[in-house]
């Protein structure tokens, strides 16, 4: 069984992340979404809320269940967790040249430490290239419409978070 390992903060999951998940599901039998949990980093959504949002997206928009999409946490080196779960490859999304430069450096470092794990880059769709979780936070915090940038369940969760 091929297992794609897709790590990030997913705070919250965006349509750009959804693009990468769709592509990953085409390449692997199973995708493990690994949410990085760092005590010193303040998150808008709790780990449990992010798991629920991603699981709902998998079920409702991607039509996949826990046999194809699993959500876990990690707080160590990404490659260590990828090895622990038996990942076949790492998945990273690319929006622009800045992402490419950063992700190539990370892939190089990961490749030295874990040569058995290749990194597969998936380009964002044209509409997904402008989306960042940070911008989504800012728009939602000011009561703006984020429905173009996040799945419907996430837009609803943001409305509840920011009470608008």
From Swiss-Prot:
Gene3D superfamilies: HUPs (3.40.50.620)
Organism this protein belongs to: Bartonella bacilliformis (strain ATCC 35685 / KC583 / Herrer 020/F12,63)
Catalysed reaction equations from the record: (R)-4'-phosphopantetheine + ATP + H(+) = 3'-dephospho-CoA + diphosphate
HAMAP family associated with the record: PPAT_bact
Name of the molecule in the record: Phosphopantetheine adenylyltransferase
Chain's role: Reversibly transfers an adenylyl group from ATP to 4'-phosphopantetheine, yielding dephospho-CoA (dPCoA) and pyrophosphate.
Source organism phylogeny: Bacteria, Pseudomonadati, Pseudomonadota, Alphaproteobacteria, Hyphomicrobiales
Domain of life (superkingdom): Bacteria
GO annotation (BP), single: coenzyme A biosynthetic process
Enzyme class: transferase
Pathway as given in its UniProt record: Cofactor biosynthesis; coenzyme A biosynthesis; CoA from (R)-pantothenate: step 4/5
Sample GO molecular function, one term: ATP binding
Family from the record: Belongs to the bacterial CoaD family.
